[in-house]
Structures are given as C-alpha cells and as structure tokens.
C-alpha cells in the first residue's frame, strides 16, 4: 500500500476489487489495527468532529468464520452481549437476534462446531450487527455460501448500510456490481473509484476489467 488518500461516505456499500496480492486484506488489517501502518492515520467524522478511527469503530467479517466452537449459538450471543453490555445501543433479546438472521429455534442451542459454514457466517455477521460498528469490513464474506444464504446476506447488507461505511472486498465482479453502490479498485497500492457516469452495465464491467488488466501488465 502507498499514498492511500481516500474518503468513504456512510450509507454506501463500496466494492473493493483488485487482483490477487493487490493488498485488499492488508488494507483491512491496517484499518482493524491488526497491522501497524508505517505512516499516516485513518480518520472518521462523527457528528461533525474528526477523530482517529478506533477499534470500537470497526466490525470485521472474514471469509472463514471464526467462532468459539465449544459454545452453543445462544451461549456465544449471551457472552458477547454480556461483555459489551455498556456499549450496546437498544439491544434486543437473544431470540429476536436469532429471528433476525433466520436461525431456526432448533439450531440455537447447538454447539457452534456443528453449525454449517453458512450458519457460522451468519453468527459472525450477527455479532457485528449487535455491535453496530461505524465501519463494517467484509473480506469475501459470501465465499462458499449456498445460493439461498448468499441472497439472504446480500439483502441484510443492503438493509444495514445506512449510518455506517461498508467496504466489501471480493474477487467476484458480478457480485460487486449487484450489491455495491460504488466500485473502488486497489491499483498499485492506491485506491481509485471507477466512474460509472453514462455507462451501461456491460461498458462499466469492461472498464473495470481493463483497469485490472492494466494493473497486471505494469
């Protein structure tokens, strides 16, 4: 990454595209403080006040869900809600959250190790919904999901985009075009928006492919 200077607006889903090794996950890890940046800072405007992004601002959903498999779904949600009790805004009951994610009653008291990939992904998404982060990072979150669960997740993300910045990293261009409001390329370590003005969907897709191909040839 180099000379990253970019402004994301709340209320939009940004599709982050780039070739393999372009630095998409590195950018997320820097935002999430998992990697230390060599220079510069990330800022967020809240209520007209500019400040540095903190860990509490970030929600991070990985392509491979990480959940404590020795807990049941209900125990996991209760644990998360208990440790974040003071910061939760208008919390619902555990079963209301399960209903929201279409997790069936018979699955709620199963161990997480017995959950399918899609259900683990739903649980990972659910704790981010409960936390209500200002910035939601999604690193290939729909990978390996079946068609029904993937469509449910897309509808969920559209409903959640208000009042937060959502950045969706994917290598599937059609998914990005279907879900995202803006397409951003990570090109030679620099972020740049792909302008869609006056282009139909085919022309827009061709423009993205040309930009990615140019990156690979340089």
Which functions belong to the PLM regions below?
Residues 64, 70-84:
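Q-loop/switch helix immediately C-terminal to the Walker
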Residues 40-54:
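Conserved ABC transporter NBD signature motif
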Residues 17-19:
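The feature captures the beta-strand-to-loop junction immediately N-terminal to the Walker
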Residues 188-189:
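Conserved ABC ATPase "signature" C-loop
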Residues 147-149:
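Helix N-cap at the start of a conserved alpha-helix in ABC-type nucleotide-binding domains
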Residues 32:
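Helix-to-loop junction immediately C-terminal to a conserved catalytic motif
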Residues 136-140:
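Catalytic Walker B motif of ABC-type/P-loop ATPase nucleotide-binding domains
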């Amino acid at each position: 990454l180099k000379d990253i200077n970019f402004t994301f607006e709340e209320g939009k889903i940004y599709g982050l595209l780039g070739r393999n090794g372009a630095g998409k996950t590195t950018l997320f890890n820097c935002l999430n403080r998992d990697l230390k940046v060599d220079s510069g800072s990330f800022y967020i405007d809240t209520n007209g006040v500019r400040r540095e992004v903190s860990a509490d601002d970030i929600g991070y959903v990985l392509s491979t869900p990480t959940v404590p498999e020795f807990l049941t779904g209900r125990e996991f949600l209760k644990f998360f809600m208990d440790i974040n009790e003071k910061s939760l805004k208008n919390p619902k009951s555990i079963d209301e959250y399960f209903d929201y994610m279409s997790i069936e009653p018979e699955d709620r008291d199963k161990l997480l190790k017995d959950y399918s990939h899609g259900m683990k992904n739903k649980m990972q998404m659910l704790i981010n919904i409960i936390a209500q982060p200002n910035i939601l990072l999604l690193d290939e979150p729909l990978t390996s999901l079946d068609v029904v669960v993937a469509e449910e997740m897309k509808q969920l993300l559209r409903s959640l985009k208000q009042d937060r910045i959502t950045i969706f990293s994917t290598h599937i261009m059609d998914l990005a075009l279907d879900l995202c409001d803006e397409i951003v390329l990570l090109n030679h370590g620099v972020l740049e928006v792909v302008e869609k003005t006056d282009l139909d969907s085919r022309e827009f897709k061709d423009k993205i492919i040309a930009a990615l191909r140019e990156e690979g040839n340089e």
